[in-house]
């Protein structure tokens, strides 16, 4: 079975498993919120314009499943095609699994969710060939998802990434603190949402080097359970990110 077959088979399995748990309102927009209690699965394609004239095509499936009204399990699997090593290479790149415990809170009188959890990141590719990350890591996280009104979501989040197994080809271990600021606005007149996601990183193995990437996402639900979105990532030309110049992508989202 090829990679697209694997991804679509995985999506079908998740769609067929119908949970009895209630989902939050505006679930199409809330699925882009890491602190929201929703069940969904995305199938996504992204193109990355890398440094030195190289590029990368990434085929991904990402989603979340509520094991309990307060316990969320997320998944992400990536397959890439890249010429960053000088020739075309294809492989599975990385698997991510994340468990998040959600607690309803109301600081300053604002409806919110406290999110505490941890993420496991498993390298599946080859770092030398550009198809792998070169490290297996764990990443505890803490964040608050703010809901000031029915149309806006604001998420403040921080993770610490620590590699416990590193490829010999990689110069440094992973020791990174990653603050994140997300704004999501529901667009009921369009049946969709807009998301701005600023992802920052402080590399403690590289003289506390600060890096950042901005993701802009616009999506629309075409039915209560199916939607789609497009996204743009801005890299070093705008925000001094060294990983890539820019990235564009699109996805199908299934709520279940």
Summary of predicted features, one role per range:
Residues 1-32:
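Cleavable N-terminal export/targeting peptides
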Residues 22-165, 169-256:
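Transmembrane beta-barrel domains of Gram-negative outer membranes and organellar outer membranes
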């Amino acid at each position: 079975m090829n990679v697209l077959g694997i991804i679509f088979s995985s999506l079908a399995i998740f769609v067929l498993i119908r949970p009895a748990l209630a989902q939050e309102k505006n679930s199409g927009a809330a699925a882009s919120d890491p602190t929201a209690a929703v069940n969904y699965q995305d199938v996504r394609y992204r193109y990355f314009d890398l440094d030195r004239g190289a590029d990368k095509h990434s085929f991904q499936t990402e989603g979340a499943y509520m094991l309990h009204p307060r316990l969320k399990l997320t998944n992400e699997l990536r397959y890439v095609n890249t010429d960053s090593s000088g020739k075309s290479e294809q492989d599975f790149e990385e698997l991510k699994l994340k468990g998040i415990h959600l607690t309803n809170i109301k600081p300053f009188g604002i409806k919110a969710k406290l999110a505490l959890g941890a993420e496991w990141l498993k390298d599946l590719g080859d770092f030398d060939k550009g198809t792998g990350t070169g490290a297996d890591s764990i990443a505890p996280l803490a964040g608050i998802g703010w809901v000031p009104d029915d149309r806006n979501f604001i998420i403040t989040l921080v993770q610490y990434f620590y590699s416990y197994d590193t490829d010999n080809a990689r110069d440094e271990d992973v020791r990174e603190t990653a603050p994140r600021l997300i704004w999501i606005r529901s667009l009921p007149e369009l049946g969709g949402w807009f998301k701005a996601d600023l992802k920052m990183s402080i590399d403690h193995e590289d003289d506390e080097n600060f890096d950042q990437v901005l993701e802009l996402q616009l999506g629309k639900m075409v039915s209560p359970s199916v939607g789609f979105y497009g996204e743009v990532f801005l890299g070093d030309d705008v925000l001094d990110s060294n990983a890539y110049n820019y990235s564009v992508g699109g996805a199908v989202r299934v709520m279940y």
